[in-house]
Amino acid sequence: YTTYKITYECKQSNILDKKTKNKISAFAIYKSKSKWDGSNWESPTNSTDDLVYKDEMIVDYVQDFILIPIDDKGKIINPAPTTLANSNKIKVIDILLSVRSQNIFYKNNKSKTIYSLGKNANKKFNDKFLREQIVVSAHTRNMGL
């Protein structure tokens, strides 16, 4: 069978604000897919496999992206593990993705609070954009750490 590695990266958005001509304060999430050739991960640029690719943008206008490692007792692991041995203690990862609308949504400025997962890093906005938060839990048996 063929083994693939899927990687997600969060990078600064390249979208320019129409008024200021500066980059907007947001990020974009990119997805890459590599193939194991038996000894190394094959670079998508050198691969002949049509199923591999590099840095395909999957969502833009990302305002917040949080990954929280959880152990087998349901407790947040803080600080997050930095070694492979300690990463095996992670059983679930809670993922929060906060995105804003591309265009103005409200007629007038609205005061909004975006709540953070498990931290005191709530953000307040007072503008005309719609914001949504998506929260999922991923079990690490489905991921390679």
Give residue ranges: language-model regions:
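Extracytoplasmic beta-strand-rich oligomerization domains located immediately C-terminal to a leader/signal peptide
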Residues: 1-50, 59, 140
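Short linear sequence signals and composition-biased patches located at protein termini or domain-edge surfaces
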Residues: 42-145
